[in-house]
């Protein structure tokens, strides 16, 4: 463990701003950050995206545009980011290695940066067999770690993987996913260390429903000094019922839901309300854990619940976040830069 920690002294990834994006500014200021997932529509109507984004923007520092999560096809992450940047929102482009090779991915990074996307989350991606088109041909030319390294090289060295020069490199804030709640547990902090070494500057975790397990994980993360090398946002989300929780635990890989949580739901008169309250309670405990920099809220097809959960948790106390505030701040920054 000490040897791993020592290797990070040469990688001060948190020194100095990388992008001009809101998420990085909030994290570097020491404020507790909030991100959330926009579940992409099965539609070509931009209003379907804008309606969801408007709800999330009231409480979020950045909005994740998922990239065919679960290997199911929806509007692309790139398309959603194009819409969100045009409307003045701060998106997180998710890139899954499942569907595109290194040539396409590097081109997407440049295109996204040119549109004003400042945040990229690098993912290996779910296997095609988990989705509704299992006959699709998987690519996996890169994985999440090699993708992080590739984009970092584009940004910091202004070069493609081929070695060819990039005239204007992308100024992107790099993120990755982590799952503290799946075995082998001892290996999870070491996996995080490898992603940070590859270039990850922020981390969004899988759903957390077990605070004690998170505390143990963060204890090792702090011992390794990894919390000083990246910003960790812990995944949370409401459970609709005890039945839904049992189904998720049995069918969604990597999601750990303790018996005590399911029993609490099962014993509630209004299980949906209790699921929201459990999420709020978890956020209140998560914010007290040293080394945690924020939360990442995932509420599938329930964006309206995100605002209620975040507001009731109190983590945005004394902070005002909405679309108009973000646009005003952006106009002020642009005017300052010009002057």
Residue ranges and their predicted role:
Residues 97-115:
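Glycine-rich anion/phosphate-binding loops
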Residues 324-334:
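Short, low-complexity, charge-dense intrinsically disordered segments
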Residues 45-47, 71-83, 101-107, 127-147, ...:
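Active-site-adjacent beta->alpha loops and helix N-cap segments on the catalytic face
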